[in-house]
Amino acid sequence: MSMFKVSLICSLLLVVFGAARGFLGRGDAFRRKVSVELNPGLAPPLSLPPGVGLVHLRGLGDNDTLHFVLCNAGAPALLLVHSNSTRSAVTVDWPEFINSSSAGSLRVEPESSVTYSSALVFTRLWEYDDVNNTADPQKAAESSFYPPYELQNFVWSELNTTLNQSEHTVVLCGGEKTQSFSNGSLCLQVSVFESQGRDEAWPSLLHNANSSQLRVWINGVTPRGNNSRFILEFQSVGDAGFQSRVDMRSSIDDEYTPSIFKVSEWVSSPVNSSSVWGFSQWKPVAYRKARPVFEDATACRHSELVFVNGTPPSAVIQAYFTHNTRIYGLNISFGLAEDPVFYDATKYISWTVLMGLGDPPSDSFSPLIIIIITVGLVTPLVFIILGGVFVCVRKRTSQSTAYEPIN
């Protein structure tokens, strides 16, 4: 009986940990080989004027290529182009690009290999005096808004000083020549990934090899009011054959982003189709310190999606998109209603968004949580089965050893 029970326990444990191992083995194993290039194709005697530069981040797959291009000329923008060729390349007609950013001066060749293109452009930074502490720009009086900061007029840092080849990241910082930005800046950090993973820093968005990450922060900017809050305005540019919508998904797990159970997804689909070709994804949370603790988190909300007429004032957008485009605009506002902590308290706010190809990554439980759930569900079942087996064996043993009269 003892050997039977031991064998049964071992079998059940193998089932439990086999199931857990099956869960742990799942995941996105797709990888890309990422390379980073500054000002592709630029050669002497050509040189760039101050404040003009391109960074090309290339993700090479087994049978396709994903191109990301960051430009600091005009309003900062990140361009995404997918090609079904492993030999595709970014080519720039530098004289045309420098002089007028004329349409077609930046291309991905062969052009016939391009299947999808989109871009995110950061156009304005708004500031308003939230005297009623609603953290809702829609409820703020028009007179409480200050003139917006036009990001196309910012003086941006040189890209070659912040390019990290090994980490596949680049940081772009800029500001106005005004008192507000005398000791402050608005910065964007772009990261491109070889495989699935997460940043250690909150909000720890799940990324994959088809996505890039933009982290935006405002640091040290002197507010123009005692109760100032900021709004980031940005636009999505894509081909005319695509339409956009913003979806909100809920989750039962806040393991990676404490107290946040929702994720917003700005997705792009072909007209008259629900299939997703591209996305921007973020969680409705921002942070008031560079190294935040739980208390440094604050809410952020997005406005309604609106259709925008006119090309954004960005050199890379004007240089790449040669055909009809469809442009949408969205605002992200920061702050929580009735929160006594305004921007002036820390003079810092950060927000993170993913931009990528295909369906947005979807959060799932971590390996630790899966093991805990599996063991928690199966352990009671093990004891029930063992109890039943023990009772049955004990009963049979009692019957077989009972006194039987001799005929």
From Swiss-Prot:
It is found in: Lysosome membrane. The chain crosses the membrane at residues 369-389. It is a single-pass type I membrane protein. GO terms for cellular component: lysosomal membrane; lysosome; membrane. A motif (Lysosomal targeting motif) lies at residues 403-407. Residues 23-368 are lumenal. The keyword Signal applies. Its main location: membrane. Residues 390-407 are cytoplasmic. Keywords: Glycoprotein, Lysosome, Membrane, Signal, Transmembrane, Transmembrane helix. GO terms for biological process: protein localization to lysosome; protein stabilization. Residues 1-22 form the signal peptide. InterPro entries: NCU-G1 (IPR029382). Glycans are attached at residues 63, 84, 99, 132, 160, 164, 183, 210, 226, 272, 331. PANTHER family: GLYCOSYLATED LYSOSOMAL MEMBRANE PROTEIN. Belongs to the GLMP family. Required to protect lysosomal transporter MFSD1 from lysosomal proteolysis and for MFSD1 lysosomal localization. Interacts (via lumenal domain) with lysosomal protein MFSD1; the interaction starts while both proteins are still in the endoplasmic reticulum and is required for stabilization of MFSD1 in lysosomes but has no direct effect on its targeting to lysosomes or transporter activity. This is Glycosylated lysosomal membrane protein.
